[in-house]
Amino acid sequence: MESGTVLLESKSSPLNLLHEMHELRLLGHLCDVTVIVDYQGVREDFMAHKAVLAATSKFFKEVFLNEKRADGTRTNVYLSEVQVVDFASFLEFVYTARVRVKEDRVQQMLEVAEKLKCLDLSETCLQLKKQMLESVLLELQNFSESQEVEASSGPQVSVTPSSKASVPAGEDAHSNGLVDSSDYPIERLGNGLSPETPSKKCKEKLDKKKDVAKPPFPKIRRASGRLAGKKVFVEIPKKKYTRRLREQQKSAEEAAKNDKCPQDQSPDNERVEAEPASKSEACPASVEREESLQKVEGEKEEEEGKDGEEKKKSNFQCTVCDKAFLYEKSFLKHIKYHHGVATEVVYRCDTCGQTFANRCNLKSHQRHVHSSERHFPCEMCAKKFKRKKDVKRHVLQVHEGGGERHRCGQCGKGLSSKTALRLHERTHTGDKPYGCTKCDAKFSQPSALKTHLRVHTGERPFVCDECGARFTQNHMLIYHKRCHTGERPFMCETCGKSFASKEYLKHHNRIHTGSKPFKCEVCLRTFAQRNSLYQHIKVHTGERPYCCDQCGKQFTQVNALQRHHRIHTGEKPYMCNACGRTFTDKSTLRRHTSIHDKNTPWKSFLVIVDGSPKNDEGQKTEQPDEEYASPKLSDRLLSFGENSHFNNLLEVQGNVPAVQENSSTDTACKAVVSQDALLTTSISALGELTPQTVSMPAHLPSLTNME
């Protein structure tokens, strides 16, 4: 028996698929295209998936199918004709099939959909506009009917041959926003016909003329009666709407001329203004709307003429709607609320590059910080300041005893405010109320906790423009930049040495003062720097966190591990420029330089060799300068005083083991040097080289004094 087939269909799968793709885009996962939207200086990058964009937009589909790129590289698509806010809404619609926008932006979204060829979004916008238009037309129809009912139930207008239609006392004809009914087209009556009884044919033609002149979508701003004070807006593009009304108005005027009744051709010169009593109920709506439209269009033409004059005087002009503005603030507000372009104005100081929230703060900064003018003097001591608040602070702290009012009771330090004093007192009490939620660290200030949290999050917001190095704190970036500029603004007054940071100078001054404020609680040994104390404490605790991956030896400091690694690799990056010998660390080189000259600073002998290779063949490390040649043994001896005793030195064939300059328990690594290095290796080797009849100079052991 054959089994039938069944259909497995999930109604929620499409929605779930869209939801998951939307989540992936928000997290930036699996995105293979970056859409860069740059519109009138406002730029933003959007990450997305090619498959989703190509499936919903024919524009992106054509771009992706025609592109030629290398595998593994992300595609960049540049859009300059779409606003950032509109493309963000477009992306949300593509990934969620729905987006919420303001009513006045529906037309913009329709234009974006047409540019990007997104049929789904285009159909959605058109359907929504149709619904909006139908609702507005229905409201206008109800409004028109209510106006006709009110007009029919209102008082009758008396007609006189010599004047226009009168208005009831105390009521302004234009107070309700409608055009006066006296402007209604007049009828010329003759052949003995009285004004009160016009011919039936003329009345019929008059009705036709009114019907033709009545626009289908009248634009009425305000209404009288029950709806007075309410505004009715029709969401139709202005240019198309006004053009359509003008065409209908012209056609209505032509029809009115062609359909004039025979009585209009009468030679009778008597002109009578009349309004048939039988038509008094049907006249108000259509004719008044036509008159109101003519009035509105006349006002628009006057406004356009005024706008043309203002544009000549204006400094800022909108490229979207050609509206001109005299001030930048008004222009920015216009493009933000009417076109959705949220421009980010950056107020940056040209001198120091600092940015500010508004123009006022920038002007204040330029006026007070970069200006040497001091217009605000102190009345007590005549000292001048740049700002008034600086004078107030000066008077408060200096003349009114502000320093004594905020002075620490334990150390006597004066603080500028109570808040600063309270924070300072925590250094004495040890109070640390701000604790980290991810570790046991505690801090006395919230700013210190915020900086500490970057250790857990990995955030390094401060980036160096030169090398791309990132830092957790701004002052660390400032110190780092001085490595590139070579700036050392902090100089020691004792020895004249300069430093890049104030902290380094503070540590250096302890060399001259002999201050060692950090004491070990175990052995009572004192140190000049806190970091040195931390390293020393590991001696008591036995902690050796740094382990060699080749021999397993452990160290308390990372730089000690780095020096130890050079024993395995044979790297000797530090060379003595007097004898050409190389060393694994600077401390050994410093001790070695005392052989040559104790009075000369050891750094004058230092030469750093980049990428020093391992010396497998017993030759010295390669010199950094190709023209530099290692001097011969006899030449090197003659370079020192009283070395004439060694003129008869014998050359020794072969190589001898050299003394290790680094004390280490690892005896597996041996270094082999040539006979040119015998002089500075061991005293015993020199004893073999020297003839027995010649006595060794007394100063020679100092030349070969090693570690």
UniProtKB/Swiss-Prot annotation:
Transcriptional repressor that binds the GZF1 responsive element (GRE) (consensus: 5'-TGCGCN[TG][CA]TATA-3'). May be regulating VSX2/HOX10 expression. Belongs to the krueppel C2H2-type zinc-finger protein family. Keywords: Cytoplasm, DNA-binding, Metal-binding, Nucleus, Phosphoprotein, Repeat, Repressor, Transcription, Transcription regulation, Zinc, Zinc-finger. SMART domains: BTB, ZnF_C2H2. The modification Phosphoserine is found at residue 612. The lineage of its organism: Eukaryota, Metazoa, Chordata, Craniata, Vertebrata. Gene3D superfamilies: Classic Zinc Finger (3.30.160.60), Potassium Channel Kv1.1, Chain A (3.30.710.10). It comes from Rattus norvegicus. Residues 198-213, 243-278, 287-298 have a biased composition (Basic and acidic residues). The keyword Metal-binding applies. Pfam families: BTB, zf-C2H2, zf-C2H2_6. This is GDNF-inducible zinc finger protein 1. InterPro entries: BTB/POZ_dom (IPR000210), SKP1/BTB/POZ_sf (IPR011333), Znf_C2H2_sf (IPR036236), Znf_C2H2_type (IPR013087). A zinc finger (C2H2-type) spans 316-338, 347-370, 376-399, 406-428, 434-456, 462-484, 490-512, 518-540, 546-568, 574-596.
